Amino acid sequence: VTQSVIRAALELLSDKIYKIILYGSYARGDFDLESDVDIMIILDCSLEEIRAYRKEVSRIASRISLANDIEVSLLLIDRRSFEERLDILPFYQNVLREGVALYG
């Protein structure tokens, strides 16, 4: 599943990708049959560009979910916002601390 996400993300977003991080239960190793695969894609681009990609990224997540019979959640964020939120929001701190870098 993660390799499919990386391939699709690189095809769509190529040089804009800063990092791809697997986070949540699959990254921690405490997943079960009901768990989804949580992946954050951090981009070096503007918020406007991210908005333009959201619909296609949602399609990618749906396609991979259906093909693998598992829910795939893809979260897009720009690098600047991610770094700003790191200092104040525990969610982003957890992603960085517990996450597994898949790319970048």
Model-derived features: positions:
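Catalytic core of pol beta-like nucleotidyltransferases
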Residues: 1-19, 27-33, 44-104
